[in-house]
Every structure is written in C-alpha cells, then in structure tokens.
Amino acid sequence: MIVPLLYLALAGAYLLVVPVALLFYLKLRWYVVSSIERTFMYFLVFLFFPGLLVLSPFVNLRPRPRKIEV
C-alpha cells in the first residue's frame, strides 16, 4: 500500500510540483543570469521536460505589452 503512494507522490512531484517551481524560477531569473547559472537552467529544463510539456498548454510566456505614455 505504501509503495503505490510513494510512486504517486514521486510522479506528482516530477510532473507537476517541480516544473511549476522551475517555471517561476525561469521567469524571475531569465534576463539576469550568469553563464553558469544559464547552463544549470538548461539542465533543469532537460531533466524536467515531461512535466514542462504537461504544463505547457496552461502557461503564457509571452511578454506583456508595453505601456506607452504620451
């Protein structure tokens, strides 16, 4: 009974929890990272790609429109 729950918890963490945290981290740090940190970010995207693919229909990464004041 405990083994299926463990597998379910690990699958949920791999497919949902960590990718959501990774998306927030990428959004905050994308334009201000060093080259070493960017390499680490690419590694995390490669590692958690299935979870990012699951979340991709629900994520909007387009930049917000600029407000031009006249």
Swiss-Prot record:
The keyword Transmembrane applies. Its EC number is 7.1.1.-. GO terms for cellular component: plasma membrane-derived thylakoid membrane. It is found in: Cellular thylakoid membrane. The keyword Thylakoid applies. It catalyses: a plastoquinone + NADH + (n+1) H(+)(in) = a plastoquinol + NAD(+) + n H(+)(out); a plastoquinone + NADPH + (n+1) H(+)(in) = a plastoquinol + NADP(+) + n H(+)(out). Pfam families: NdhL. Keywords: Membrane, NAD, NADP, Plastoquinone, Quinone, Thylakoid, Translocase, Transmembrane, Transmembrane helix, Transport. It is a multi-pass membrane protein. GO terms for molecular function: oxidoreductase activity, acting on NAD(P)H, quinone or similar compound as acceptor; quinone binding. It comes from the Bacteria. InterPro entries: NADH-quinone_OxRdatse_su_L. The chain crosses the membrane at residues 2-22, 39-59. NDH-1 can be composed of about 15 different subunits; different subcomplexes with different compositions have been identified which probably have different functions. Belongs to the complex I NdhL subunit family. NDH-1 shuttles electrons from an unknown electron donor, via FMN and iron-sulfur (Fe-S) centers, to quinones in the respiratory and/or the photosynthetic chain. The immediate electron acceptor for the enzyme in this species is believed to be plastoquinone. Couples the redox reaction to proton translocation, and thus conserves the redox energy in a proton gradient. Cyanobacterial NDH-1 also plays a role in inorganic carbon-concentration. HAMAP family: NDH1_NDH1L. This is NAD(P)H-quinone oxidoreductase subunit L. It comes from Nostoc sp. (strain PCC 7120 / SAG 25.82 / UTEX 2576). The lineage of its organism: Bacteria, Bacillati, Cyanobacteriota, Cyanophyceae, Nostocales. The gene is ndhL.
